[in-house]
Amino acid sequence: MTRLLLAACAALMLTGALHAQDPYFPAPGDEAWERRDAASMGFDPAALEAAVAFAIEHETRHPPELEAVSPARDLTVSVPLTWAFEPHSSPIGPLQARGEPSGLIIRGGYIVAEWGEPERVDMTFSITKTFLSHVVGLAADDGLIGDVHDAVAPYVDDARFHTPHNTPITWDQMLRQTSGWWGELFGKPAWADRPQRGAPASALIAGPPEPGSAYEYNDVRVNALALAALHVFRRPLPDILRERIMDPVGASPDWVWHGYDNSAVEIDGETMISVSGGGHWGGGMFISAYDLARLGLLGLHRGVWDGERLLSDAWFEASLTPGEHAPGYGYMNFFLNQPGMEGAVFNIENAPGAFAYLGAGTNMVFISPEHDLVAVVRWIEGGQRAAFVEQLLAALE
């Protein structure tokens, strides 16, 4: 007990020392990012190496009989197989094979461990939702959205937002995945996303939930938010993201935010692609681990990069506020640590302020403000995320 307490105190003292210094922000370019020895940044090197080995060992794979004929890394096959139980499950956006398990551990802004192919641009699935909520946050900060509790419909010139059911839906509800938005986008009806297995018409029969009454993870509704944001900015969302977030944090030019083959819309007489909020039907954000780490470092500093505020602190406060119907979820895609809550995605007593951006695969950007820590982990089994985080935090001396 005493040894554990002393170790915790030492970690807190080092974290305090790190915060007392001017925060380090890497210059553009993967090679320009300064590396530091793990021990000098408060890690037990052997324990950190073991945590990294754990992440590599627990790569997401198919059952052996399927892995033998179609490796899980071939996302052009594994993604359609994952969603084959859904009606309207066919991909309509790009898919590509992924790389090997990869990741980065960053403390105090410095890289202390990296593995795999962190420079490789891969699908990131639902972490795309985190990028989307950042862009919606920019619209709110700019005053283009007056209040997140405003109804979305008056901002959008699209009849699907003006039905009796959808008209009262608010921005806040869409961001928290409690909107219950009902309709069809790009050939995908909302009822066809994640129905009960063996009962493909279950959501169609049940009908839409009342707006704000239930949390439902639904990519059609996420895509509706992306379309609404496009109507607000009246410019392609990837352009906004690049100018306002990714270029200022020094991200590479290699990331791509895809829409679908059929998601072109006309705004002010110009044809634009409405991007997707994930890779469910293909598309979404394709990005490297290094660039994901820059997003994580921006999150660690609550929207500030090297003295420049890119996104308001108020937006991060809202993003990190638990929702009424999903206490482990803030705005998309902020998964919140819930110490003491059974069944929580993360239940970490010594990192109460921790949160993560999560996508299928699993892709994870884990952020612990208490430890001045960002971890990017790609292609780890979903059931092993929490165990990896436990090992990582235990490696802090």
Question: Where would I find each of the regions flagged by the language model?
Answer:
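Active-site-proximal loop and beta-strand segments within enzyme catalytic domains
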Residues: 34, 56, 63-95, 124, ...
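Catalytic-site signature segments of enzymes, centered on catalytic residues
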Residues: 110-120, 183-262, 283
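Bacterial N-terminal signal peptides
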Residues: 7-16
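Active-site SXXK
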Residues: 44, 109, 123-148, 174, ...
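N-terminal leader/targeting segments and the immediately adjacent pre-domain N-terminus
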Residues: 18-117, 142-145, 231, 395-397
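Active-site Gly/Thr loop motif
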Residues: 263-279, 283, 321-374
